Amino acid sequence: MLDLALTSDQEQLVATVRDFCAREFAPTIGANDRAGHHDPEIFAKLASIGLPGACFPQRYGGHGLDYLSLGLVCEELEYVDTVFRTVLSVHIGLVGMGLYTWATEDQKQRWLVPMARGEKLACYGLTEPNAGSDVASMQATARRQGNTYLLNGQKVWVSDADTADFLLVFAKTDPKAGHRGVSAFMLDRADHSKTLRTEPIEDRLGIRAGDVGSIFMTDVEVSEADRIGDEGDGFKIAMSCLDNGRFTVARRCHRHGAREPRRLGEIRS
């Protein structure tokens, strides 16, 4: 028979994260949501208890926890507010796991290690104003010039766009090839202060305390070493990243499904 009980380590993890969220996040989230204010210290607080590196191997600065443990962490963050779960979902699920799967060893040392250590925050830029999340129809381009590329285009509805240090973005290296012409690039905000710009999307209906924004790229010059995978691998990488990220979203739904019957009972009583 399949044993679905949590291990003692997993139970301790849940208790630790639950207590942390109650102490650090719960007291201010209501006011921040009403005001549309994003606390820029969220990631630093998550890093203070090692959550950004939860499921990455220790050789990359992580803690080597299993994927179920990541789901449990996300459930506890979600219980307080989706803002906190989203930060970790994007950082680990969309970007970190993508790098762990597709990046070279040098790239992992360059990007994944500081991410897992909680030193750098990452975001994921796929959606566009005129294409949505239809990768084949994206308009952002990466024009090759020798050993470099010039990236131009816009990404929207990007979680942590304004606060992220690293940005995983997708652009067409072959605009005529549909989804087969998309490539993936990792940008370090510090290297592109003059050509990379981000802006918050304000007065949103939901996730008002989150950092959600747009990315604007104007002749952002990157090298071949900044490309993840080969040219044309962008679609596969994007879908792989989304698979990992959606796991944490599913845990969000599981958490709400377990919580709402209790709330309904409290209301009826």
Where in the sequence are the language-model features?
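A short core secondary-structure module
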Residues: 148, 152-197
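Internal helix-loop-helix
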Residues: 48-119, 159-166, 178
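A structural signal for short hydrophobic beta-strand segments in well-ordered beta-sheet cores
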Residues: 140-143
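A short, Trp-centered hydrophobic/proline-enriched beta-strand micro-motif
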Residues: 118-126
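Short Gly/Pro-enriched turn/cap motifs at secondary-structure boundaries
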Residues: 115, 130-133, 157-160, 174-176, ...
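Glycine-rich beta->alpha junctions and the first turn(s) of the following alpha-helix
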Residues: 2-13, 197-269
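A structural motif shared across PLP-dependent enzymes of the aminotransferase-like
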Residues: 14, 37-41, 62-70
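Short Ser/Thr-interspersed hydrophobic loop/turn segments at strand-loop and sheet-helix junctions
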Residues: 50, 74-78, 171, 187-194, ...
